């Protein structure tokens, strides 16, 4: 993916596009950090696998930050450490909830992907840069796949998930559709 992104032109970037990249870098880190923490607690393979995917999402956004000479908000890559206090608070809240049971942990995973999808949709609508849109669209495919995986696991536990950030209709469409592949260009 990085090879393709590097082939796209560097376009003028707005303050809003910069803000989106900074926010998504830390939001992808939030996902990775929560999943690693929950993996250490529950040893459910899904958390380890998706944390690895979140690392590639972080790397793709970092590549764009470097491409556009935007300072990386991830100054300290330690788990649970964020530049933006909102992500530090969210990390603590989500880990506390996920610490209660395996089902709660899986619901936390679905919640993170729910938030990710909503935020990516917001930022996609605020950018016209081809490379940024491409990365966001691929991150969104990943988030939809992750949501499907968490919901499948919840169903295996006899539980389910109610969306908090995206519409019920969008959620139903996501979980009833097939796994998506990245890099469609």
From Swiss-Prot:
Name of the protein this chain belongs to: Uncharacterized protein MJ0754
Organism: Methanocaldococcus jannaschii (strain ATCC 43067 / DSM 2661 / JAL-1 / JCM 10045 / NBRC 100440) (Methanococcus jannaschii)
CDD domains for the chain: Ferritin_like_AB2
């Amino acid at each position: 993916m990085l090879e393709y992104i590097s082939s796209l032109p560097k376009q003028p970037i707005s303050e809003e596009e910069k803000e989106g990249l900074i926010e998504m870098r830390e939001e992808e880190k939030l996902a990775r950090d929560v999943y690693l923490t929950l993996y250490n607690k529950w040893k459910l393979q899904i958390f380890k696998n998706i944390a690895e995917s979140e690392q590639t999402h972080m790397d793709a956004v970092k590549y764009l930050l470097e491409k556009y000479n935007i300072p990386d908000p991830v100054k300290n890559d330690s788990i649970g450490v964020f530049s933006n206090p909102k992500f530090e608070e969210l990390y603590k809240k989500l880990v506390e909830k996920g610490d209660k049971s395996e089902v709660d942990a899986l619901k936390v995973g679905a919640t993170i992907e729910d938030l990710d999808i909503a935020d990516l949709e917001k930022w996609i609508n605020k950018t016209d840069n081809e490379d940024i849109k491409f990365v966001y669209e691929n991150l969104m495919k990943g988030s939809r796949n992750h949501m499907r995986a968490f919901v499948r696991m919840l169903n295996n536990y006899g539980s389910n998930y109610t969306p908090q950030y995206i519409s019920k209709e969008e959620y139903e469409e996501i979980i009833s559709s097939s796994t998506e592949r990245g890099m469609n260009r």
